[in-house]
């Protein structure tokens, strides 16, 4: 078994070994998934603005941590996008991202309210832990599935960052002075956040990343169609261990035992669902 390198925080684009790129090892479905992921990651500034509204008045350190998180997320999108541009010269990150931003902006990004749409700062951090659980497992799966050396490196670097981001939000969650939420309330927040991604974010990012502007008239956006295509492209990289790690991280954020019956049951159900979705 090959042991993945350990990547430290603070890398930049020049640290990636771009010269090792091997076009013969680019897998089309994985390329399509990476293009879509690049757009989602590149959209971090809007999330930063929203989170800074939610945590207004919480201190300089919190604001600085959110800004650093946003810079790292944006760099993830830039690295994935550059790799995709090398693998497919027809892909242009900035153009695809402009289309994505024009058609996808969650309502709470532009709302004037300062509170969280999750009802509290604790709820917001649970939602963020859910996202970071998903991204850390996803990029770990891409790292393990890819034979292309540069993508393997990029995915490994991003996965390491996402685990650190999970810890940031988990620690922020537990630092809040607000009353704790009940388990079922936390679970509803987690499920709602997953459904938000299932609605349009993943499907529309896949569409904008993989359908060229000149192809739009013949291929109009259909959420169900492109959600299915996005699922086929991305879900095939997972092994059961990636899903179980994801579930354990979510369960931990909910305040339950990450190695208990709930984690085992949820892991089995999620694996079954994803296996069916990628079939």
Where are these regions (language model features)?
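Non-heme di-metal
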Residues: 1-279
């Amino acid at each position: 078994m090959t042991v993945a390198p350990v990547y430290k925080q603070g890398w930049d684009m020049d640290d990636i070994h771009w010269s090792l790129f091997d076009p013969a090892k680019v897998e089309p479905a994985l390329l399509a998934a990476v293009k879509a992921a690049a757009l989602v990651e590149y959209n971090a500034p809007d999330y930063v603005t929203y989170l800074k509204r939610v945590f207004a008045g919480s201190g300089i350190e919190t604001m600085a941590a959110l800004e650093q998180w946003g810079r790292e997320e944006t760099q993830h999108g830039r690295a994935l996008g550059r790799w995709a541009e090398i693998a497919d010269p027809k892909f242009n990150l900035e153009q695809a991202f402009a289309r994505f931003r024009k058609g996808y902006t969650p309502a709470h990004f532009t709302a004037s309210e300062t509170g969280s749409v999750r009802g509290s700062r604790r709820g917001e951090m649970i939602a963020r832990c859910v996202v970071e659980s998903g991204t850390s497992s996803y990029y770990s799966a891409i790292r393990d599935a890819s034979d292309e050396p540069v993508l393997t490196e990029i995915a490994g670097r991003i996965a390491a960052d996402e685990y650190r981001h999970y810890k940031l939000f988990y620690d922020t969650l537990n630092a809040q002075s607000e009353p704790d939420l009940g388990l079922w309330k936390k679970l509803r927040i987690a499920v709602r956040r997953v459904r938000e991604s299932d609605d349009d974010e993943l499907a529309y990012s896949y569409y904008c990343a993989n359908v060229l502007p000149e192809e739009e008239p013949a291929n109009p956006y259909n959420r169900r169609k492109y959600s299915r295509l996005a699922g086929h492209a991305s879900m095939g990289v997972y092994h059961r261990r990636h899903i179980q790690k994801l579930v354990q991280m979510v369960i931990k954020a909910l305040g339950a035992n990450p190695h208990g019956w709930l984690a085992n049951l949820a892991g089995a159900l999620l694996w079954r669902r994803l296996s069916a979705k990628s079939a």
